[in-house]
Each structure stands twice: as structure tokens, then as C-alpha cells.
Amino acid sequence: LEDEFSYSTKTGNLNYFDPGLLVTKNPEHKLNILWLVAESWRADMITPEIMPNTFAFANEQQWFENHYSGGNGTRMGLFTQFYGLYGHYWFDVLRNRRAPLLIEQLRAQDYQFKAITSSAFTYPEFDKTIFSSLEPEYLQEFNEGHGWERDQKNTGDLISFIEDKEREEQPFFAFMFFESAHANYYFPDEDIIESHYIEDFNYLTVDIEESMPQIKSRYTNATHHLDRQLARVYKVLEEKNLMDNTIVVLTGDHGEEFMENGRWGHNSTFSQQQIRVPMIVHIPGMEKKKRTDSSSHIDMPATILNALGLNMQAGQHSFGQDMFAPDYKHDYLVVSDWHGNTVITPEVKIIFSVKGAAYQASSTTIDDQPINLGDEKSDYQTALSEYLLEQNRFFN
């Protein structure tokens, strides 16, 4: 798979960031960071019916309603939000065991760390990438039982960590990856809000197309369970007055498709359902606002570093921008999978894919309808030219 990228993108000689970029001067007021990521979390799940607690929480924060993951799978979806790099950098970052600038900067600022997952840190290899510079005791995996059972236990552990640290002057960075919404979409009886769900869900015997509405009902119920676990976190943040000194990031790794464009699941196409995810950000002192401009996972490092008062030039370490900057605007976004990158403009998606020795390029409208780029009237050429010039900026 690594070789496939070499057909269309440069690899090797990674020049990610100069250690001299690290800011050693301490900001006057250090903020905690709570970073919550949910597996397979579609952007359209935050409704009063499905996720009432998160709907209420989002309406009091910065809610980016047109947000895109940096990938259609977990690996690229998490990689892009911590590094601010396109997915084809994954292989070199993994080979070089390079932690992201964001984590290195927090280490330089003497943060306390806790990273919890209801999946595993070893696959994808986040223990060798995102969290590679953290001591093993800061990483907690619990993956016994169904996803909802893991999330219940891990949410309790996350809350215990927060409560233990909230009285200390030393700031903390806490991360949790939730697994409730992952297929087969398991949930306890108390989270059934759609009763017409498929009970005997066997990949080998189920008629996927015929049963898709009932399969999606399982997903809806599982997402409702996710909401109840998140509500436990919102409650402790309020009760401990942590909203005044804690940055909160709430997002998904990628979306989930239910045959809207002929596929089920994720990591197969760049359909809106597979790449659109929630993005809710709380910055202490910032007024609530719903934002409809396009935003991306690659913006997160620049956004959080600036919110911490470190004010680093984003172009020196990522492809992203500070989402709260007055001039924030993307002419195009990039979303990645194993096989290549997709350039997304407001009107079209241009997919560059390499599978084996076969190089493929295709295009669709923003709503995933096939098109001939030769007939396209919008100015996608400018965005495409800029992407081709910029994509290898962090390789020597």
C-alpha cells in the first residue's frame, strides 16, 4: 500500500517541522484540552431526537456544520486532525516515529496526559505516530465486550482522570476514542429509540440492501448511546467549572454510509456520508456560533495552538488554518484514503487513486454525481493547480 502512494506523491525525506518551532515561553494562563473523537460519527446525527444532550451542548459552542474529516477511515481521520497534513504523509510519519507538533508543544509546556481508547492504539498505529512520544502508562486501552460497554467503562475512567486533575495547577490533555457507533452498532435496551431495527445482524446471511433501513436504525440507537456517554462528560465539565479553563474538541474520525450512494460503511468512497463529520469546539471566552463555511480536520493543530496563545505560523507545520482567524477560508479541501487524495472544491470532487500499478482519476459533483470535468463551468482548475504545487510541501 505504501508503494501505491509513490506513483502520485513524493515520499521519503520527511521535513515535517523544525524543533526550533517549539515555543518554550509559558502562556500566562494555560488551558486544559479535552479531545473527544467518536467512531463512524455522521454529521447529521446531532438532532434533538437522536443526540439531545450533544445537540444542546453544540448549540452553546462553536458548531461547524459543514465540516469534513481528513479521511474516510479511522487512520487518516485521526492522523489529519492531529498533524494537519494530508494522508499521504502517514507512511513517512510512521516510518520516522514522528509525534505531531501539537503533542510535542504540550509536552514542552509540561502538560499532564491521558489517552483512552475503546479500540486499540496499535491498529491503526497511533502508538507509533500521534502518541509516540508519550510514556506507555499514559495510554489506556479497554476493548472487551461490545463498543457501548467499552465506552461506558472508559467514560468513567476519563471522568475520574478529569476529577483528579481539576484542582491541580498543571494543565492536562485528555483524549478519548468512542466505539459505540462502530458496526455492528450494538447498544443496550435503554437506548432503543428506533424499534424497527434488525436484531439478527449477520454479515454472511443478511440481505444488505433489503435490510439497510433496519441496519441504520441499529446505528441510530448506538449513536443515542454515544450521546448518553458524552452527556456524562458534559456534566462533569459544568459541575467542576472546567468550561472556564478547558478547550473541548468534539468530532468524528469519519462518517458512515447506508447505501445513499450504493455503499455501506466507510473507507470505500468519498461520498458526503463517509467524509462529513461533526465538529464542535469550545474555547473559553468565545461566544457561541453556528458556522456554515467549509472546515477540515487539517485545521485543528493551527486552531488549537493559536487558542493556547502560542501563535505559530500554520504554514510552517501544516496545511491547515486557524478556524477562528478573520480571514479563514478554504478554496479547496483534501480528504485521503489508503490509495490517494481527493480534492474538494465547493462544486466538485476530484479523486486521485492508485491501486496496484493502475493510476485512476475520476470526478463527481459535491453531492457525488458523476461528471465530466471538461463540461464543468466552475473554476476548479485554480484549486487543483494549487493543490498539485502544495501537496509535497513537507518533503525535502
Q: Language model features by range: what are they?
A:
Residues 39, 81, 106, 176, ...:
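Generic structural signal for small/hydrophobic residues in well-ordered secondary structure
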Residues 238-285:
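Histidine-centered active-site microenvironments of extracellular/periplasmic hydrolases
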Residues 1-202, 320:
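Active-site-proximal alpha/beta segments of enzymes that process anionic O-linked groups
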Residues 76, 274-276, 338:
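Short, solvent-exposed loop/turn segments at the edges of secondary structure
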Residues 93-100, 213-226, 269-275, 286-302, ...:
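A short beta-strand-to-alpha-helix junction
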Residues 40-43, 87, 119-122, 178-183, ...:
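Short, solvent-exposed loop/turn segments at secondary-structure junctions
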Residues 155-163, 199-246:
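A long, amphipathic alpha-helix that forms part
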Residues 22-25, 121, 235-241, 283-396:
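Membrane-interface soluble catalytic domains
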